[in-house]
Amino acid sequence: MTMRWRPIAEWAGFQLVWLTCALGAAQGWNAPGVIAAGLFIGAALAMKRSPSSECIAILASGAVGFIAESALMVAELVRFAAPWPSSQLAPAWIVALWLAFGVTLPTMASLLGHSLVIKAGIVGFVAGPLAYWAGARLGALEMTGSAPLTYLAIALIWAVALPSLLIFRQRMRQ
């Protein structure tokens, strides 16, 4: 695949993973999302020049997601559908989604360009809550806290998580 089509294919692939995770969870299934994320990550890594360094960024994304989503659950702001392996921790499908999101970090960094931290913070603050809103509409999660507080918490998590993951990946590559 030529370089100019890779970001489009990556974006489309991630959207497919997101949709598979959300729709699968809404039906009470973790497996479709986990499998889709695994296939997406595997395909993306097969096209990378140094897949081992990308794996670290992907794992970091999964760890951040596990902590963030578990915190939202413990704070009783969000309840996820298909809560496996525990109803108190982030489910497998949402962690798989965060792992797949880690694949998109290099493209996102190049698209944001200069002032990466500020732009990523703004993108996270806006796009994070929109994704949760869409997921809730599909039945993948339920907002259990007050809507303004829950969306503010999600916006703040993403406003910190996205720039942090991009900075981590940048520093890893130096």
Language-model features: locations:
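Aromatic-rich, lipid-facing transmembrane alpha helices and their immediate juxtamembrane interface loops
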Residues: 1-174
